[in-house]
UniProtKB/Swiss-Prot annotation:
Key words of the record: ATP-binding, Nucleotide-binding, Transferase
Highest rank taxon of the organism: Bacteria
UniProt catalytic activity: 3'-dephospho-CoA + ATP = 2'-(5''-triphospho-alpha-D-ribosyl)-3'-dephospho-CoA + adenine
Acetylation is among the record's keywords: no
TM annotation in the entry: none
Pfam families tied to this protein: CitG
InterPro entries for this protein: CitG, TriPribosyl-deP-CoA_syn_CitG
Task performed by this protein: Catalyzes the formation of 2-(5''-triphosphoribosyl)-3'-dephosphocoenzyme-A, the precursor of the prosthetic group of the holo-acyl carrier protein (gamma chain) of citrate lyase, from ATP and dephospho-CoA.
NCBIfam families found in the cross-reference section: citrate_citG
An individual GO BP term: prosthetic group biosynthetic process
Record-given protein name: 2-(5''-triphosphoribosyl)-3'-dephosphocoenzyme-A synthase
Uppermost EC category: transferase
Length: 301
């Protein structure tokens, strides 16, 4: 049974499945903004993370550190309540039409981030993914449907069904980094992951996290293991934008090698050094790790 981490970050004592279920159902909306903030904080504080900002170093980044991430999280966290409220208020709108209703909230949330960080993009991917999940949670709750891992991810998939076609397949030029990578490599990035209902998370990361914790790993070790699983399977456009497809192959192969044995923190530190030397940052996998941690605390079905 997953242990339950309360919004204030204090790990509760073991409780029965029925109590966990009641907690999750009762507070699925009331504290979702706190849950998102906790997941984002967990991700940045987790150490060591190859190529990423953590408590040991700034990874392959020269313009951000843990303190800046914390400032960013504080700035964007209140906006996730607005996503949830929008989903709740538009419960009569089909999911396929819901994305346009929350785009202005996403833009405002990004502006809050950029204002707080003085122009540094710390959480654009997180805003996109968590904004969609919060919107879905509000929509499901207003319709009297259960908020579960499956219902959240299925709802996001329905919301983003046409996203790749509308924003990538029809683009005439590479106006954004995502469009450039799609035109050059066929990578759909965060849009494709959302349109798939976060398939990489559901098929790889969540099972890995659940198995690791069931095997007795502490949260930090289980999350580091899960991060490696994500790095091994995620076609991370953050990596490709810095190192091309060769860079992606390097990260994926390295992660697969480490997964072949028990988790070794010294090996993670060496991987960190290797990614920094190549200026590679698996930021997409970091976003998906935070997403995995949030989803883990909801019932599966």
């Amino acid at each position: 049974m997953p242990t339950l981490r309360l919004p204030d970050g204090v790990l509760s004592a073991a409780v029965s499945r029925s109590v966990v279920s009641e907690y999750r159902e009762r507070y699925s909306l009331l504290d979702i903004d706190q849950r998102v903030a906790h997941a984002l904080t967990m991700e940045v504080m987790l150490t060591p993370k190859p190529g990423l900002v953590d408590r040991a170093n700034n990874g392959s980044h020269r313009d951000m550190d843990v303190a800046l991430f914390q400032t960013s999280i504080q700035a964007i966290s209140p906006w996730f309540r607005h996503f949830t409220d929008a989903g709740y208020q538009h419960a009569s709108v089909p999911l396929a039409q819901l994305l346009s209703q929350v785009r202005p909230i996403g833009i405002a949330c990004e502006q809050a981030m950029l204002s707080a960080t003085k122009g540094v993009n710390t959480h654009k991917g997180g805003i996109f993914a968590f904004g969609l999940l919060c919107t879905a949670a509000g929509w499901l709750t207003a319709r009297g449907e259960r908020v579960t891992q499956r219902s959240l991810c299925d709802s996001v998939a329905a919301m983003c069904h046409d996203l790749v076609r509308n924003e990538l397949e029809t683009c005439s030029g590479a106006a954004t980094a995502g469009e450039h990578l799609y035109l050059r490599h066929g990578l759909t990035g965060a849009r494709g992951e959302a349109a798939s209902g976060f398939n990489t998370v559901c098929q790889h990361a969540l099972p890995a996290l659940q198995q690791a914790i069931a095997a007795g790993m502490d949260d930090e070790t289980a999350l580091l293991q899960t991060l490696l699983v994500l790095m091994a399977h995620n076609p991370d456009t953050n990596v490709v934008s810095r190192g091309g497809m060769d860079g992606l192959a390097f990260v994926q192969d390295y992660a697969q090698r480490l997964l072949a044995g028990p988790l070794d923190r010294q090996a993670l530190i060496k991987m960190d050094e290797a990614l920094i030397a190549r200026n590679l940052s698996p930021g997409g996998s970091a976003d998906l790790l935070a997403l995995t941690w949030l989803l883990y605390h909801y019932p599966t079905e």
